[in-house]
Amino acid sequence: MADSTDRRADATRQQIIRAAAHQFAQRPYHDVGLDDILTEAELTKGAMYFHFRSKHALALAVIDEQLARAGAAVQSLVDRKLSGLETLIDVGYLMAVEDICRDTARAVLHLLPVVGRGEGLQTTVLNNAVQALSVVAERAVAEGDIVDREPQDLARMLVALYLGLRQAGDLDDPEQFLRQIEQGFVVVLPGMVPNDRIDYFLQFIRRRTALAVKTASANPVAADDDRAG
């Protein structure tokens, strides 16, 4: 009986998070009311307050949910044992497809500057991303695919490049957004990669762009974490 109750409670919690993610993905945080979320979730305020004390707490839960998912997805890429630079490129396309296909991913980038800034969460998340990518960048330098650069500087540049493209791009035009990601890589590649390896990585980027376009086209945006994975 206890297990059944726990499963129902967890299902309700996920239902609320999905509805909140969809709302936060579409509109600014301050424009979303609890009634909007509860109407979409088809639940009462009592059900929500059992799990979340406030809209702020719910927004933090959406962020935590996506960060856990993204962390696991990036670790899965690292575990594939591709070269360091191939992995860095794959991480960029993974993030792009997540942002295109998942409400939770879209919501997080909307929420972090608003909800995360005051508590230092935004800084922590970005610093953690830079640190994680620095480890992969260090491997890429050791493998000779990236010229001798400070791995943390490379990681920070890649994070800034993606966030800038994300801010300026249109996720509702997936192919255009992914082509912009491709062009971003093409622009920075000559400053990172030895001349004798540029052609290989240009071809790798083209293949990854085509794969990402295909994946994004097959997975319309969804809050459900099972849809685009």
Kindly give the residue locations of the regions a language model identified.
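Basic, helix-initiating cap at the start of DNA-binding domains
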Residues: 1-27, 31-43, 56-60
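Amphipathic alpha-helical packing segments from all-alpha helical-bundle domains
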Residues: 71, 116-143, 149-159
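Amphipathic alpha-helical interaction segments
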Residues: 15, 86-94, 153-160, 179-183, ...
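Key DNA-contact positions within bacterial/archaeal DNA-binding proteins
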Residues: 46
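C-terminal peripheral helix-coil segments that are non-catalytic and often amphipathic
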Residues: 130-131, 135-138, 142, 171-229
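Base-recognition residues in the alpha-helical recognition helix of bacterial helix-turn-helix
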Residues: 25, 49-53, 65
